[in-house]
Design a protein with these regions (language model features):
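Hydrophobic anchor at the beta1->P-loop junction of P-loop NTPases
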Residues: 6
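P-loop (Walker A) phosphate-binding loop of NTP-binding proteins
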Residues: 9
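ATP-binding Walker
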Residues: 12
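Walker A/P-loop
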Residues: 15
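Conserved substrate/cofactor phosphate-moiety recognition/catalytic segment
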Residues: 19, 23-62
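Conserved phosphate-donor/acceptor-positioning beta-strand/loop module used by diverse small-molecule
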Residues: 82-103
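Conserved AAA+ ATPase "sensor/coupling" helix adjacent to the nucleotide-binding pocket
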Residues: 102-110
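Small-molecule kinase domains that catalyze NTP-dependent phosphoryl transfer to phosphate-bearing small molecules
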Residues: 109-163
């Protein structure tokens, strides 16, 4: 039984790596956004943290092998106690910000540019993300009593998943 947390700051590649690794390992995969936002609603109506914690806990109990990606995995002691290992993805701030802006443009197009209806909202998000510090995640990870695998998120995805596969399986 493996319950793997993939964490790192926004734009580090958590979702990309999580999806790819889950395909290789044949594990169930979820991202934090899957819990915060109902597929039938937009991003304007997130679920409460309590709801998210309960939904995540239920899935972790229902799936023998499970990968979850989030900036941190701080979703209560019930959830934290189920993780068997954590993967921390580090990416420099400049690369992360480029990835985030590109992702935003791919998702929202010109709406996120100056003059667009989402410009202010996206700029606020970019500022929030830009001010986050790796220490926030690292300090939280160090409070866990599980193996932590650190990986460079700027490496090619196939190299990352091969390295992670070998560490998880062996």
């Amino acid at each position: 039984m493996n319950k793997i947390l993939i964490c790192g700051l926004n734009g580090s590649g958590k979702s990309t790596i999580g999806k790819e690794l889950s395909n290789i390992l044949k594990y169930e995969y979820r991202d934090a956004e899957d819990y915060y936002f109902d597929k039938n609603n937009d991003y304007s109506t997130p679920r409460s943290k309590d709801e998210v914690c309960q939904l995540l806990y239920n899935d972790m109990m229902n799936y023998h092998n499970f990968i979850f990606s989030s900036v941190k995995g701080n979703y209560g002691s019930n959830v934290e106690s189920l993780f068997t290992c954590a993967i921390y993805i580090h990416v420099d701030k400049e690369t992360r910000m480029k990835r985030i802006r590109k992702r935003s443009y791919l998702q929202f197009g010109d709406r996120m540019l100056e003059g667009g209806d989402l410009f202010e909202k996206e700029e606020n998000f970019f500022n929030f993300v830009s001010n986050r510090d790796d220490d926030e995640v690292i300090n939280w990870l160090n409070s866990l009593n599980i193996p932590i695998i650190q990986i460079d998120g700027t490496l090619p995805i196939n190299q990352i998943t091969k390295e992670l596969y070998n560490k998880i399986i062996n």
